Design a protein with these regions (language model features):
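Solvent-exposed, non-membrane alpha-helical residues enriched in polar/charged side chains
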Residues: 52, 92-95, 155, 179
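Short, flexible active-site loops
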Residues: 74-78, 96-101
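ABC transporter nucleotide-binding domains
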Residues: 1-80, 87
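Conserved beta-to-alpha transition
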Residues: 82-84, 88-94
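Short, charged/small-residue-rich alpha-helical element at the C-terminal edge
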Residues: 99-185
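ABC-family P-loop ATPase nucleotide-binding domain
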Residues: 184-193
Length: 193
């Protein structure tokens, strides 16, 4: 491939070439913007392995990504919303702050259930994942850790739409953290305006 022009390379090959060019001088700090865009899953794993090797060798990496599964690979995260820092910490710290606020809803008609939940006070986001819904609320669990009050409100809203459903608390993931941080930040901005 020595004579191949960069413009004729695949997305993954271009990304590997860009990384090689970026590290050839042994930088102490490396900024990577969406480093694995247009890269297949296997190449993505290889790419991240190279990044960890660089980190082990002492290079500080700053990675921007909109892919939460990539963000989970990082040691520390900072979530920006319109240029403002709205959350930061380790993946475990960030997801831990959302304990008791995420639910999985299983319903016969997930789209109808999603519409029923859209206007429930305190619901920050509803996303369909497969045949289930992932619901993020702005309300934390009760002091005893119970989420039954929130779960019951969600179930009641869906039942009111004539849709039987099962609602269960779920562990938060980084996508939930991102949605909570950016929606909460927007609400603050809208109130200030």
């Amino acid at each position: 491939r020595q004579k191949q022009l960069a413009g004729t390379m695949s997305g993954g090959q271009k990304q590997r070439l860009a990384l090689a060019c970026a590290v050839i001088h042994g930088p102490e700090l490396l900024f990577l913007d969406e480093p694995t865009s247009a890269v297949d899953p296997e190449s993505r794993r290889d790419f991240w392995e190279r990044l960890f090797e660089l980190a082990d060798a002492g290079t500080t990496l700053l990675v921007s990504t909109h892919l939460m599964d990539e963000a989970e690979r990082c040691h520390r995260l900072a979530i920006l919303d319109h240029g403002a820092l709205v959350a930061d910490g380790t993946p475990a710290e960030l997801t831990g702050r959302l304990a008791g606020r995420t639910f999985v809803v299983e319903a016969d008609d997930p789209r109808r259930a999603q519409r029923a939940l859209a206007d429930v006070p305190g619901v920050l986001g509803v996303a369909q994942v497969g045949n289930a819904l992932r619901v993020l609320t702005g309300e934390a669990a009760a002091q005893d850790g119970s989420t039954s009050g929130v779960a019951q409100r969600l179930q009641d809203a869906i039942a009111k739409a004539g849709q039987p459903a099962r609602v269960a608390a779920a562990a938060a993931n980084l996508e939930d953290v991102f949605v909570a941080a950016t929606r909460t930040g927007r609400a603050r901005t809208e109130r200030a305006a």
